[in-house]
């Protein structure tokens, strides 16, 4: 059964917002209301459709039970009922999912970090492939990707790249990408045609705001230095590069991508803030995980989550045992949504089961 009283409150809230929109409101209030309406619209539509279907089912049941109904009409009603039952179940499930507790971070922008792991140059190339996959996926969502820092590999790709992904719901869609991604393929430099295995680590952090993390100046060790290029040579004469250490956690962020020390410091603080915030969230989630099973995988960055097997053209997500034989489309970013959708559905099913709603 669905919580009818709660659904009535949602419908009333939706109607009140629509009515208020017709009055004179400030620009800020207008933006706030349209955002809330956009969040309510899907569940309100589902509730209205569900109630219409239940009323239709009740009408059919009454027709079937009525002795005055002739045989032909009764047969037609009985034939229509299974489709309506299926639609009813579908709408009820949609409503249950919409009523699940939301992650407060889901609407946040994302700090995306991709690092080459084991595998040398091939790992750097794979890290580059992964970053371009996410870049394309973000573009398809209408999001903006801004590279904050990048360390290129000697043969291409990246040893490490950090970017900000800006867009509504970015964290909700990308949060299950954190973990170790493994690739199996024949490198261009492999003369014998042997398949090599390499890896890259992906971290997806919700962008933290200043109010989320209290960073005391006394807890920071800030060092400046001259930026270095490939081979270690200094590339400018001013100390624009910066390294910030958060002493309590030991988290270190280095930044030298801009010639401006001020910009490098601002970027480093932004990354540091998100890493500190994420570390605390990880600690809390780890403490809770013993009591709940509503996560897709452990969320541990050291967990191997996915394998990209180029010779077989397949991608396997190990958390949900899903294999897609469309590796080119996934690595291009065009079919990544199929994996993300499946992970989201699995996560929601686990949440429903934990709440006794499945």
Curated annotation (Swiss-Prot):
| Location of this chain's protein in the cell | Cytoplasm
Post-translational modifications reported in the UniProt record: Methylated by PrmC. Methylation increases the termination efficiency of RF1.
Q: Which UniProt keywords apply?
A: Cytoplasm, Methylation, Protein biosynthesis
The UniProt entry's GO CC annotations, sorted and at most eight, read: cytoplasm
Q: Which GO terms describe its molecular function?
A: translation release factor activity, codon specific
* PANTHER family, per the entry: LD18447P (PTHR43804:SF7)
- Function noted in UniProt: Peptide chain release factor 1 directs the termination of translation in response to the peptide chain termination codons UAG and UAA.
Q: Which SUPFAM superfamilies match?
A: Release factor
Q: Which organism is it from?
A: Nitrobacter winogradskyi (strain ATCC 25391 / DSM 10237 / CIP 104748 / NCIMB 11846 / Nb-255)
Please report which protein family the annotation says this sequence is part of.
Belongs to the prokaryotic/mitochondrial release factor family.
Q: Which residues carry this modification: N5-methylglutamine?
A: 233
Q: InterPro entries given for it?
A: PCRF, Pep_chain_release_fac_I, Pep_chain_release_fac_I_sf, Prokaryotic/Mito_RF, RF-1
Q: Which gene encodes it?
A: prfA
Gene3D superfamilies to which the protein is assigned, alphabetical:
3.30.160.20, 3.30.70.1660, 6.10.140.1950
Task: Please tell me where this protein is predominantly located.
Answer: cytoplasm
**What is the official name of this protein in its record?**
Peptide chain release factor 1
Could you tell me which Pfam families the record lists for this protein?
PCRF, RF-1
